[in-house]
Amino acid sequence: SLSDKDKAAVKAIWNKISKSADVIGADAMGRMLVVYPQTKTYFSHWSDLSPNSAPVKNHGKTVMTGVALAVSNIDDMTTGLKALSEKHAFQLRVDPSNFKILSHCILVVIAMMYPKDFTPEAHVSMDKFFCGLSLALAEKYR
């Protein structure tokens, strides 16, 4: 679980990167679809799955809106992300292992865009945060 120090670190990093959230999300989505091509099955209804396509960029923005929601509910992500968990479990039927894949891609992009801020300590806190976020999204699968 996240310590108070982790929560403070996540909030500090989010405060710094949130202005670029759309770019981070778009890049992370594009990377996920290229590096983990099996994830494309969830987006087969999109006309263009290339990294810079409009659907990929738009979904990246949507994903980062969810990350913002998780940051704002950092003390209880399971409750705060309940509706998103239900949507992904019952409507979209996304395999919850994909949450970890996309989380990793987001961490990679943050590290590339903010190398001075993404210290080893920040990395640990953000990784723990995304593990918690993934777990919260997987809650309705049980």
From Swiss-Prot:
Tissue: Red blood cells.
One Pfam family from the record: Globin
Sorted UniProt keywords: Acetylation, Heme, Iron, Metal-binding, Oxygen transport, Transport
Other comments on record: This fish has just a single hemoglobin. It displays a weak Bohr effect that is not effector-enhanced and shows a propensity to form disulfide-linked polymers in vitro.
Gene3D superfamilies given in the database record: Globins
A Gene Ontology molecular function term of the record: haptoglobin binding
GO BP term (any one): oxygen transport
Species this chain originates from: Lycodes reticulatus
Globin domain: residues covered: 1-142
Family as reported in the entry's similarity comment: Belongs to the globin family.
Record-linked InterPro entries: Globin, Globin-like_sf, Globin/Proto, Hemoglobin_a-typ, Hemoglobin_oxygen_transport, Hemoglobin_pi
Subunit structure: Heterotetramer of two alpha chains and two beta chains.
Positions of heme b binding: H59, H88
Gene Ontology, cellular component aspect: blood microparticle; haptoglobin-hemoglobin complex; hemoglobin complex
Its job: Involved in oxygen transport from gills to the various peripheral tissues.
Designated name of the protein: Hemoglobin subunit alpha
Chain positions found as N-acetylserine: S1
